Structures are given as C-alpha cells and as structure tokens.
Amino acid sequence: PGGRPALLWNVKIAADPQRSADEYRLTLGLLLRDGGYSPADVDAVALGSVVPALTHTLREALGRLCRGSDGTPVPLRTVSAGTRTGLVLQVDDPAQLSADIVTGAAAAVWLYGTPVAVLDFGTPTVLSCVDANRTLLGVSIAPGMQTSLDGLRGAAALIPHVELRAPESVLG
C-alpha cells in the first residue's frame, strides 16, 4: 500500500545442525524453484541464523547456490544485533538480540513503515515494537505455541492430543 514494497515470498525450514551444506543447498534451491524463482534471481543474501552451529554451513550452501551471471557468489551478509539496519536498539543489552528479532523488526519497518509491532509465532513467541523514530523499544519473549502445547501435554496427561490449527469455534 502507498508505494511500499511487497513481501514477495516467505518460507521456513527446520534447523538441523547434522545436515550438510549440500543438503541445505539442494533444499533451498528446490524451495526457490517451488516459489517460482531461480537461484539466478538472487542478487544478495542476508542470513539471520539463530543456530550458531549452522551459520557456517548455511553460508557455504548459500555461497554455492546463489551466484551472479559471472559465476561468483552474490554478496552475503550475516545479520546480528550489531548489523546496521537503520534501527536504534533501545534495549538493556543489544548484544543479546538474536538475528531473527533484528531482521524481523527491520523487515517490518521496510514493508510497513513506522510505528510497527512484530509478532513472530516461532519456537518462542516474540513481540517487538518499533516507534515512529525507528527505535526498537523492546522485545517480549514467551514460549511458542508448540512448545506450550508440548509442555501442557507433559504436565496434564488427560488433555487430549490436539493439532495446532484454527478451530471451527473459539469455544468448544
């Protein structure tokens, strides 16, 4: 809306430190093609890894997958709390911010402008808020939906197995 860029495509895959760079390269290539893109369409990569053991493997996979017309790897930047995003990090310890929180906030500002709130329903549920001055005001982290459901099942054995999907009715 209003001339702002649109999110073209979004996909998530499970993080598995046992997978090789070749496995990630093939998986990412297939996912790109499934989304209607080619690795040749990629002109730069921002990697926001929250699994340090995977960062090198993913850099290797992406470096071999995403290459320019001359065959050289496209620019690849690993994002962290110290990466310049145009955001002011007004949190107690900016070094503790994970890459997914920083990239999510920066992407939300890029897509929707400010002020903006970001709610990420991943392994943890993360709420981040950016004000009109591009200041990341803070982050709230809680157990994710699957994590909470697994904990509930473990603590209350009589609760039946339910899938995480939209219910037909809010109560029932």
Predicted features by range, described:
Residues 1-33, 135-158:
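Short glycine-rich, Thr/Ser-proximal phosphate-binding strand/loop in the N-terminal lobe
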Residues 155-172:
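A mobile "lid/hinge" subdomain adjacent to the ATP/sugar-phosphate binding pocket shared
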Residues 35-96, 131-138, 145, 172:
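Short beta-strand-loop/turn "lid" adjacent to the catalytic site in phosphate-handling enzymes
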Residues 83-116:
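Conserved phosphate-binding catalytic cores of ATP/NTP-utilizing and phosphoryl-transfer enzymes
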Residues 30, 60, 64, 110, ...:
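Short, well-ordered alpha-helices that flank and scaffold nucleotide-derived cofactor binding pockets
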